[in-house]
Amino acid sequence: MPTRPLALVTGASSGIGTVFARALAARGYDLLLVARDGARLRVLAAELATTGASATPVVADLTTDAGLAVTEEAITHAGRLDLLVNNAGFGTKGQMVDSPLELQDQMLRLHVIAVNRITYAALQLMKPARRGGIITVSSVASFINSTGNVNYCATKAYQRSFSEGLALECGPLGIRVQALCPGFTHTEFHQRMSDDQQGRAPEWMWLSADDVVQSSLRQLEAGGATICIPGAQYKVAVFLARHLPLWVKGLMTRNVYKRD
C-alpha cells in the first residue's frame, strides 16, 4: 500500500507549476507531472527523485482530445489522487478581434474544457475516498475586464466561478476546493508579457512564485476560504474591482500596462 499522498499538477514544466511540484514533493507527495514538454518534465522528475518523491511525467497537450485522454487515463490508472492542481494556461496578445481565432479556441479548451474534464476524472477517485483537494490557478484577472486580454479574463472568471460552485458541492464530501488568484508573478508566462509591447507593470505589483504557491497550500491545508489572493496589494485591487464602475476598472488596467 502506498504511504505517500499523490498529486497531479498540470503545466508542471515551468513557472508556478514547477514551483507547486517542488513544494508538494517537499511536503511528502508523489507526483504526476503533466505538460507538453517531455524533456523538461523528465528533468524535473529526476530532480524531485533526489528528494525521495516518485514523479511520473505525463506528456500531453491539454488543448487536444488526445492529450486529455492521456491525462484522464493516468488518473484512472493511478487509482487514487489526493490533490489536483489545475495550473496549465496561457495568454494571447492584442485585442480579441485581432488575435488568431485558433489561439483563442485553444485558450478556451485549456482554461475551461480541460479544467472541467480533468477535475471530473479526479473526482471519480476523490468522491468515494471522501477526501482530497483541488486547486485551480485562476487569476486576479478574473475580477476585471482588461483590453487586450478579453478571453483570458473571461476564462479565468470561469475557473473562479467553477471553483466556488464546486466548493459548495464537494465540501460535504471532505474535498477542499480552491481558486488561486495571483497577480503579476515572476514566471516565464509574465516575463513574455512584460517584454512585449504592453510594457512592464510596476515592481511593487510583482509576486514571487514561491510566495504564491506557499500561500495557496497554507490556505488549503488550513481549510481556509475558497478564493486565495496572495499579496496585500492584490487583496486591495480585488476589493476595488468588485466595487468600482466598469469604466474606472478599464482606466486602471490600461495604466498598469502603460510603458515606463
Report the location of each language-model feature:
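Conserved NAD(P)H cofactor-binding loop of Rossmann-fold oxidoreductase domains
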Residues: 87-92
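Conserved glycine-rich Rossmann-like NAD(P)H-binding loop of the short-chain dehydrogenase/reductase
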Residues: 27-44
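Conserved glycine-rich cofactor-binding loop
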Residues: 13-14
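Substrate-binding pocket helix/loop in short-chain dehydrogenase/reductase
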Residues: 95-108
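Active-site helix of classical SDR
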Residues: 119, 155
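SDR active-site lid
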Residues: 167-232
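Residue(s) in the substrate-gating loop at a strand-loop-helix junction
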Residues: 139
